[in-house]
Amino acid sequence: MSKKIGIEQSLSDVEAALKEKGYEVVTMKTEDDAKGCDCCVVTGLDTDMLGISDTMTGASVIQATGLTADEICQQVEQKLQ
């Protein structure tokens, strides 16, 4: 079963990279979208607005600011090991 990764709308390059690696990717518009995700990738701009945190979702949250799509994929893989 593939792992479900939630990402913010603005991270389309990350979405493409994660899908290429076989992950199920969902776009998060509200905190409810993050529920059921194994990992969430956020830009930091909307973190508080969306209410996405590892304590709330039970998923690892990766801060994407300043990282390339490849670096984010590496972090996702590390968090899901």
From Swiss-Prot:
Signal peptide: none annotated. Pfam families: UPF0180 (PF03698). NCBIfam families: PRK03094.1 (NF002845). Belongs to the UPF0180 family. HAMAP family: UPF0180. This is UPF0180 protein BLi01634/BL05144. It comes from Bacillus licheniformis (strain ATCC 14580 / DSM 13 / JCM 2505 / CCUG 7422 / NBRC 12200 / NCIMB 9375 / NCTC 10341 / NRRL NRS-1264 / Gibson 46).
